[in-house]
Amino acid sequence: MKFSSGKSIIFATIASLALSAPVTYDTNSTAELQSPSSQEILGWSHATFPTIYQTCNETNARMLNAAFKDTAEITAYGKDRLLNYGVDDVYYKRWFGNGSIFTVMGVFEQLMEASKGAMLMRCDDIDGLCAANPNYYAGHHRQSAPAETVICDYFYTSKKPLSTICFEGTIVDVGPKHYAGIDMLHRYLHVPTMSMDGYVGEYAETLEEVVDYTQNNATYAVRNTDNYLYYLADVYSASVIPGGCLGNL
């Protein structure tokens, strides 16, 4: 079969485009094997992520990278909400009261763009705490190595991707740390370089205490880890279902 020179050019161009076009996937199972730092992170100019230690296998790494990407996505939603609605926003008032929006914005920036060069996520039960708490510990911060976090096997079976938010109960029912990306942010804040040596910390963990901080101690509402976690889950859920799926406080 013969082709005219014009048709030959067209076919050559199509072939060239086909060879140069990036491969895309309908699922994230292959993409998540890549480090999030090698991919575009919407909402952040210089997002950073911890190092995954060699004791984590391919499946561990895929799920941890997926959680890292969820941290970037949900904090971007939170930051965008702050910028667009400010301190008068119902979501802001619900979790930070009259606390400083500059503090909240700064914490989001710290979580996503501060250097994490020394932070390490490891998958070996080096301290034996995962085995000692098999259905409770999803991970733990290492006091003897402050930049290190151990991720237990329970993390992979108990923590869910953001894509499932609002489909397994309300946020009040399951808690924000039910979601891997939000749980990962709380693990970041156990690391002194991330928490600014405890400026942000787990000063109150129960929902009742978190709400009390909002209403009566806004200075600490903007310093309390769980206020951030509930805020992020609440705001993100509103992008899934109008009004979100917080549940009854």
From Swiss-Prot:
Cellular component GO terms, alphabetical: cell periphery; cell surface; extracellular region; fungal-type cell wall; fungal-type vacuole
Transmembrane segments: none
CDD domains per record: M35_Asp_f2_like
Sugar-modified residues: N28, N57, N98, N217
Keyword hit for Disulfide bond: no
Keyword Glycoprotein: yes
Record-level Gene Ontology MF annotations: integrin binding; metallopeptidase activity; zinc ion binding
SUPFAM superfamilies: Metalloproteases ('zincins'), catalytic domain (SSF55486)
InterPro entries assigned: HRXXH (IPR029482), MetalloPept_cat_dom_sf (IPR024079), PRA1-like (IPR039124)
Pfam family, one: HRXXH
Signal peptide: 1-20
Keywords: Glycoprotein, Signal
PANTHER family: PROTEIN ZPS1 (PTHR39399:SF1)
Similarity comment: Belongs to the ZPS1 family.
UniProt protein name: Protein ZPS1
Organism: Saccharomyces cerevisiae (strain ATCC 204508 / S288c)
